[in-house]
Swiss-Prot record:
Functional summary from the UniProt entry: Hydrolyzes a variety of simple alpha-D-galactoside as well as more complex molecules such as oligosaccharides and polysaccharides.
Annotated protein name in UniProt: Probable alpha-galactosidase B
EC number(s) reported in the record: 3.2.1.22
Species assigned in the record: Aspergillus clavatus (strain ATCC 1007 / CBS 513.65 / DSM 816 / NCTC 3887 / NRRL 1 / QM 1276 / 107)
Residues the record marks as carrying a glycan: 163, 181, 237
Length: 448
């Protein structure tokens, strides 16, 4: 068992779990369910200030997103003075031109709205945009963030000095660095068989901040952003509340499909207290079609990934807002009784268990206590209109269901998750025609 600083040592425990070796469990419940919120980076990059952050916070409330559970307003990179830390206190200094009331002032106003606030740093000497980062200053920064009232830390992997670079290279099977079966044949520096990546320098850099956060009296959700490096799925759950499993997302279907494919092979690590993070949402960004926006959100929700909105909320397209406000998908995502995500039960376009960045698994299912039924997704990963059919006897949660006379149940009440329409008693299967890159989302309920 890891050793933690005394203030929270008795309040935070590492417990053995089926889905991972360990998990961070807090008595206040922070981190049990995947995070819901908003982040500044995908919308604004470095062009942030007090006004933009507060506008996002107010829109989370005004648009009804807060009512569904969206709660974190996260300030990403570029919030501090770039020239360096305070020479006396060694603290990171908020940029007074961007945040005249400091980060604490913003946090106070966000808290007044009934929301929580997040901040950004990196496990290196500088952030990805070249601002002061936290390696070597973990305890100072954790204490500073706690005093400011910070509730969430996104912790990146930039600015790493050579003496903190891993001895080996882990295979992150992103397109461009992997073969079609998810391996990295060109990796010239693989770890020896049986190597424990939780002892790697990447893991140690992130564990140092974990210990510092656990040493303060204020709970801070810890989001690891290490891009899937160093086999983070094996140690992320003992280090943070969520962990990035790949490189960055972009507002393009090719990238969204590739990340969904990659994450579909990592879902055995996901349950209460620990969530694999396929990066922030791009709903509302770029040239994604409405179908692609829907599929992106549905897959992220079904995988119980953090749902962190990444678009400007003032002036958001009503159709995109409707996606973010889908009460069925949020209810599945925030289930307080069932922690496991939906899993692929059939790949569809490709043979089962095929690692294909262009065509992720198309058929997904997962049980839900909040919906009192099973969530079923059918994806069209192809570039043209196609039909997809969900066959009840193929779905793990439904295939063994018994009717009143002990016979296999063949009919179920079905609801269209996108429209809320009751589709009635559907027997044996349900077929739908989908536009390119769209997804059908069904709630399959009681037998009939």
């Amino acid at each position: 068992m890891s050793r933690f600083h005394l203030p929270l040592a008795a309040a935070v425990v590492l417990v053995s779990c089926l889905w991972s070796a360990n998990a961070l469990v807090r008595p206040d419940g922070v981190g049990k369910l995947p995070a819901l919120g908003w982040n500044s980076w995908n919308a604004f990059g470095c062009d942030i200030d007090d006004a933009k952050i507060m506008t996002a916070a107010k829109e989370i409330v005004n648009l009804g997103l807060k009512d569904l559970g969206y709660e974190y307003i996260n300030i990403d990179d570029c919030w501090s003075v770039k020239s360096g830390r305070d020479k006396t206190t060694k603290r990171i200094v908020p940029d007074p031109a961007k945040f005249p009331d400091g980060i604490a002032g913003v946090a106070d106003r966000i808290h007044d709205l009934g929301l929580k606030v997040g901040i950004y740093s990196s496990a290196g000497l500088t952030t990805c945009a070249g601002y002061p980062a936290s390696l070597g200053y973990e305890e100072i920064d954790a204490q500073t963030f706690a005093e400011w009232g910070i509730d969430y830390l996104k912790y990146d992997n930039c600015g790493v000095p050579s003496n903190w670079t891993d001895a080996y290279t882990f295979c992150v099977p992103d397109p461009g660095s992997a073969s079609t079966n998810g391996t990295c044949p060109d990796n010239e520096n693989p770890a020896p068989q049986g190597y424990d990546w939780s002892t790697s320098l990447t893991a140690q850099r992130h564990q140092r901040m974990r210990d510092a956060l656990l040493g303060v009296e204020h709970t801070i959700f810890y989001s690891l952003c290490e891009w899937g490096q160093a086999d983070v799925s094996a140690w992320g759950n003992a280090t943070g509340n969520s962990w990035r499993m790949s490189g960055d997302i972009t507002p393009s279907w090719d990238r969204i499909a590739a990340i969904a494919n990659e994450n579909s092979f990592l879902l055995n690590h996901v349950d209460f207290w620990g969530h694999s993070d396929p990066d922030m949402l791009e709903v509302g960004n770029g040239d994604l079609t409405l179908a692609e926006n829907r599929a992106h959100f549905a897959l992220w929700a079904a995988m119980k990934s953090p749902l962190i909105i990444g678009t400007a909320l003032d002036g958001i397209d009503p159709a995109h807002l409707e996606i973010l406000l889908n009460k069925y998908l949020i209810a599945f995502h925030q289930d307080p009784v069932i922690g496991r995500p939906a899993y692929p039960y059939k790949w569809g376009y490709s043979p089962d268990w095929t690692f294909d960045p262009a065509h992720p698994a198309e058929y997904w299912s997962g049980p839900s206590s909040t919906l009192d039924g099973t969530l079923v997704l059918m994806l069209n990963s192809e570039g043209s209109r196609q039909t997809r059919t969900a066959v009840w006897k193929e779905i793990p949660e439904l295939k063994d269901a018994l009717g009143r006379k002990g016979r296999r149940q063949t009919g179920f009440r079905v609801t269209d998750v996108w429209t809320g329409k009751d589709l009635g008693c559907v027997r044996d299967h349900y077929t739908v025609t989908l536009e390119s890159h769209d997804v059908a989302a069904l709630l399959v309920g009681k037998g009939c």
